[in-house]
Curated annotation (Swiss-Prot):
This is Uncharacterized ABC transporter ATP-binding protein C29A3.09c. It is found in: Cytoplasm. GO terms for molecular function: ATP binding; ATP hydrolysis activity. Gene3D superfamilies: P-loop containing nucleotide triphosphate hydrolases. Transmembrane segments: none annotated. Belongs to the ABC transporter superfamily. It comes from Schizosaccharomyces pombe (strain 972 / ATCC 24843). InterPro entries: AAA+_ATPase, ABC_tran_Xtn, ABC_transporter-like_ATP-bd, ABC_transporter-like_CS, ABCF_EF3_subfamily, P-loop_NTPase. Pfam families: ABC_tran, ABC_tran_Xtn. Keywords: ATP-binding, Cytoplasm, Nucleotide-binding, Repeat. PANTHER family: ATP-BINDING CASSETTE SUB-FAMILY F MEMBER 3, ATP-BINDING TRANSPORT PROTEIN-RELATED. ATP binds at residues 215-222, 551-558. GO terms for cellular component: cytosol; cytosolic ribosome.
Length: 736
């Protein structure tokens, strides 16, 4: 089949050909797969990809031929009645009997006939066919997993505009008006790089609902979002999709214009509208000149009039679509979104190539919010934002009228934004009404109920089995025993509810030292002379300090931490430290400090030599890196697992003070809870920078604000600081 498709459709994208070939071979193997459905699917795929009609017809003919051959060689399995074999079969060895003997519906004790020649009631040919059928079903699932993996591992490289137009086709006819924007897809199988992500899962998303997708690190949440964004999972084409996954590519386009250009169809329609308007103007002039010329050919006039009428109709469709897109308010909407995400009016006019990676990520988010897709997919949006920007995004999304599916570890953000929670685990998706706090409470209760039901069912089955074992050979009770055997066989297979292991982090005990511990006195700092980053900073860190530092990105928070650990030196002022003070510093980009070609155990031994393997293992185990995980190369670990190795490095330093720069990035909820508990138990001082409101609220007793080159104590809690930020932000709602 592969050769036929390749030879006839060489001009079609190789990824499409690969998918069609695999799907066709898979369907031919599967005795349950309907031929009409397969042929129709492959035909439409090839035609949409630009294949010639006659070439597609040849492929269709070949498919029909192969399906016909399959049907001719496929006999129906007979499971009822006895069939006398044409020849007897020697059954001297039980090990030679097929494992599918149970298919015949009756049992016999083979040991009782060992050494004798018996006439089997099993038709060998039909038994082999049954085995092939079972094997084909298993192969089908494996093959589909390989195709899903290949499509995700090697995605097509397209520009943003090409990808947008391919994923979100334009409808000018209005045929999609009134269609439901709800999504309901059953039987989803998804794999990535050979690992099963979902098996037979159901995805249900209702318009106007905002879903938080939660689950442990490495469970496949980001993979699911990517599959949805590429329509690997069959989302109806009238539903527009946008996924904020990676930073945009920088060029000379101003930031504001790049947001406007994100709505590709709006840009295309405006250009088309201008072309049509110019052409209509030209036609009117030509008609006017023809009307003055008595010798002019009337056929030319009629042709121009027909063209004018057609262009008038198309122009009307375009204007209606632009009105539906709220095109006249586009620039003000884009500017407001950018302002909410921290872009000043001056920054909005800067070329996108002048922004750093973090700011380009914000631009990607702004572009998605501006487009207002029917399905907005956000993957850890708070990782790229500061507290003021998170507050703006949270308020903005609460007025969003379409579907939002967001992956986030920020509990406070999910509590404010999410109307529902989807819990991804064990290759399935479970749904919960309410925000994250409600989900957390409900899940605990649901798990307890499932465990109670499982134990109850197991007790019932044990009771049935006990009766069967006792009376199955008792003549008086044999009928009752047989009845219970049938009842037991009809019961569904039970799987014990899976409980997720609780993660625990543990920092070592702290040796007490007398104050003063760590101080900054009238510190000023400049990277470039004449451009101050920090001015007149005074801060005192004690053994019982729990200081949270917040403020806009780029305000100097990380710079202040680097001054405290003497990675940077002040332009003026004094940073004083206790002579015996040990500080453990967690860098925001901690992955850069790890040798990813080593395993965690070897890395700790290399970085902190002189200790035994057991001590290294103990420190890694204190942060959930144990067993085989400690021996895996760190390049194969997830972001959260790498963070755990970094925390283990902190523990080996036996610190008096922990200085943490965005420690919650990449951690799942369970790891965040473990880190929160560990920081609260830590007996030394803590100063940390974080955008996670819930983490700050649970670990910090004082909030310091870094803004406009000044670091000052905020008089209030982190929640009050967030409200203060919102009061300074532009208001923005979504047009209904």
């Amino acid at each position: 089949m592969e050769q036929v498709i390749q030879n006839n459709c060489s001009e079609v994208d190789p990824h499409v050909l690969s998918y069609c070939t695999g799907y066709a071979n898979d369907a031919i193997k599967d005795v349950d797969e309907a031929s009409d459905h397969t042929i129709s699917l492959i035909r439409n795929l090839l035609l949409d990809a630009g294949a010639r009609e006659e070439a597609v017809q040849l492929i269709q003919n070949e498919l029909e031929k192969q399906f016909k051959e399959r049907e001719e060689h496929l006999d129906t399995l007979q499971t009822n009645g006895l069939v006398r074999l044409k020849e007897t079969i020697r059954m001297d060895s039980q090990s030679e009997i097929s494992s599918t003997m149970g298919l015949v519906g009756e049992k016999m004790e083979l040991d009782a006939v060992k050494g004798r020649k018996v006439e089997s009631r099993v038709d060998r040919r039909k038994l082999e066919k049954a085995e092939r059928k079972i094997r084909a079903k298993w192969e089908k699932r494996t093959i589909k997993a390989e195709y899903e993996s290949s499509k995700l591992v090697q995605p097509e490289q397209k520009s943003y505009e090409e990808f947008y137009m391919a994923v979100n086709p334009l409808d000018l006819s209005g045929s999609n008006q009134g269609k439901s924007k709800d999504i309901k897809i059953d039987g989803i199988d998804l794999a990535f790089a050979g690992h099963r992500i979902l098996t037979g899962a159901s995805l249900t998303l209702a318009q106007g609902r905002r879903y938080g997708l939660t689950g442990r690190n490495g469970i496949g949440k980001s993979t699911l979002l990517r599959a949805l964004s590429r329509r690997e999972i069959a989302i109806p084409t009238h539903i527009t999709i946008l996924h904020v996954e990676q930073e945009m590519t920088g060029d000379d386009t101003p930031a504001l214009q790049s947001v406007l250009d994100a709505d590709v169809w709006r840009k295309y329609l405006i250009q088309d509208q201008e072309k049509i308007t110019n052409r209509l103007s030209t036609i009117e002039k030509e008609l006017e000149e023809l009307s003055k010329d008595q010798t002019a050919d009337q056929a030319i006039s009629r042709r121009l009039e027909r063209e004018r009428d057609e262009l008038d109709l198309r122009l009307l469709d375009i204007q209606n679509k632009l009105s539906e897109m709220d095109s006249d308010r586009a620039e003000s909407r884009a500017a407001t979104i950018l302002a909410g995400l921290g872009f000043t009016q001056e920054m909005q006019s800067h070329a996108t190539k002048t922004f750093s990676g973090g700011w380009r990520m914000r631009l990607s988010l702004a572009r998605a919010l501006f487009c207002q897709p029917d399905l907005l997919l956000l993957d850890e949006p708070s990782n790229m934002l500061d507290v003021p920007s998170i507050a703006f995004l949270s308020e903005y999304l609460q007025t969003y009228k379409n579907i939002v599916l967001v992956v986030s570890h920020d509990r406070s953000f999910l509590n404010e934004v999410a109307t529902d929670i989807i819990h991804q685990h064990s290759e399935r998706l479970d749904y919960y009404k309410g925000n994250f706090s409600q989900f957390y409470a409900t899940r605990e209760e649901r798990c307890k109920n499932q465990l109670r039901e499982y134990e109850k069912q197991m007790e019932y089955r044990k009771h049935l089995q006990s009766f069967i074992d006792k009376f199955r050979y008792n003549a008086a009770k044999s009928s009752e025993a047989q009845s219970r055997i049938k009842k037991l066989e009809k019961l569904p297979i039970l799987e014990k509810p899976q409980t997720e292991e609780e993660v625990e982090f543990e920092f070592p005990p702290v040796e007490k030292i007398s104050p003063p511990i760590l101080q900054m006195s009238d510190v000023n700092f400049e990277y470039v002379p004449g451009h101050p980053i920090l001015k007149h900073v005074d801060i005192d860190v004690q053994m019982d300090s729990r200081i949270g530092v917040v403020g806009p990105n780029g305000a100097g928070k990380s710079t202040m931490l680097k001054l405290l650990i003497e990675q940077l030196h002040p332009t003026s002022g004094i940073v004083s430290r206790h002579p015996r003070l040990r500080i453990a510093y967690f860098a925001q980009h901690h992955v850069d400090t790890l040798d990813l070609n080593l395993n965690a155990l070897s890395f700790l031994a290399k970085t902190f030599p002189g200790k035994g393997e057991e001590e290294y293992r103990r420190h890694l185990g204190a942060f959930g890196v144990s067993g085989p995980l400690a021996l895996q190369k760190m390049i194969t670990l997830s972001g959260g697992q790498k963070s755990r190795v970094a925390f283990a490095c902190l523990g080996l330093q036996n610190p008096h003070i922990l200085i943490l720069d965005e420690p919650t990035n990449h951690l799942d909820m369970e790891s965040m809870d473990a880190l929160t508990r560990a920081v609260k138990r830590f007996q030394g001082g803590v100063i940390l920078v974080s955008h996670d409101v819930d983490f700050l609220d649970k670990t910090c007793t004082s909030i310091w604000q870094c803004d406009h080159n000044v670091v000052s104590k905020f008089d209030g809690t982190i929640s009050q600081y967030k409200k203060f930020c919102l009061s300074q932000q532009p208001t923005m709602t979504i047009k209904t």
